[in-house]
Amino acid sequence: MVTASSSKATGATRLKQANKAVKEPSPDDEFLESDSEVDEFAEGFQPGLAEEYSDDDDDDEGKEDDGEGYGYEESEEEGNAKWEPDNWDGNEDTVSESGSDDDEDAELRNLQNNLNSLPLSTLAKAQKSLSRKSSSSSSNGRSKEEKLALMKSKLAQMQRSKGKAVAVPDTDSHRFGSRAQESDEESDSGPETTSSTKRGSKHAPAALSTKKQVSRKRQVIEVPKPERRDPRFSSVSAGHANADLHSKSYSFLPDLLRQEFSGLKEAVAAAKKAEKNCPWAEKPMRTAERERLEVQMGQVRTKLVRTEKEAMEREVLAKAKKEEREKRTQGKAAWFMKKGEKKDLLLKARFETLEKQGGKTAVKKLVEKKRKKLASKEKKSRPFAKGAEGMGRDTKRRRVA
């Protein structure tokens, strides 16, 4: 009992001394900062004491009131401040980290949704632009030595392909190893496809691309393509056509053409008359009808003239052949007409038939028309006029009348 009462007395005296020390200002307080929690000038400061006694503050206060001191209180005479541990909670950081992770996940989901909503064309354009930027950056990153070595190797390869002596060694290209080769392949990937199949010289064999697949169906023996022919006009089935026999068999065709031509001529005249007297609204229709009839009449006229000309030529040639046959019967030697003689004979017969149909005026008109045509051809083929070219004059081509 005596010991307990003595211990209580000593505890009470210590508390009174501590209260007095707190009330009395210390001269060292001026050197402390207002927000400082640690007394830097305390001599007996030990940072590990608070960790050793990590009991609750309420229990400590209760024990102090009871007067039971365990010797863990700092002496207030040695220092003016008391260190207390911070109320740090580790769960707060974990909560903040989880919140930041959730925000990042939400942003990623928003970006993914935006990308999914974009059209494919926009994504393709973006990918192309990124690939161009990457290729340009890689090409710019190459050093000058690498480019020079690649140029030398290309020059040597071209000279070898042409069969010339290699004047530029390509040993420098091996310094850079596979990096230079890869960059060369990337830069020349486009034009290499076209130049690889090009021959080095005209005597070299033709080169084909290996990327082009060869067809499995191959023509080993070339079979002649069958040609379809009409048996009516074939020389195998019909034989040689006899013009005289054909003209005699179809002698009614020229008469039909003449009747058709006369009927079309009357129709054209009636169409012209109707075109003149028709109202303004029907003018385009009447004009189109007249033009159609005129075209048809011209076609029939051409056929009729050609048939008459062919009949006249056959008649003249048959007459000449008959006369030659009679001369042979009389004992003369065989004679064969040449192309020039045949042309003169047909021209003479043409003028004779024209004179029978239209008289001498028709022959004169035909001769004058032929002369003008030949004169125009001669003028076009003449050279420049004398003095028209050079000597500081106008170099424009002139024709002599």
UniProtKB/Swiss-Prot annotation:
The keyword rRNA processing applies. Associates with 90S and pre-40S pre-ribosomal particles. GO terms for biological process: maturation of SSU-rRNA from tricistronic rRNA transcript (SSU-rRNA, 5.8S rRNA, LSU-rRNA). The gene is RRP36. Component of the 90S pre-ribosome involved in the maturation of rRNAs. Required for early cleavages of the pre-RNAs in the 40S ribosomal subunit maturation pathway. Belongs to the RRP36 family. This is rRNA biogenesis protein RRP36. Residues 109-141 have a biased composition (Low complexity). Pfam families: RRP36. Residues 1-245, 358-401 are annotated as: Disordered. Residues 367-383 have a biased composition (Basic residues). Keywords: Coiled coil, Nucleus, Ribonucleoprotein, Ribosome biogenesis, rRNA processing. InterPro entries: RRP36.
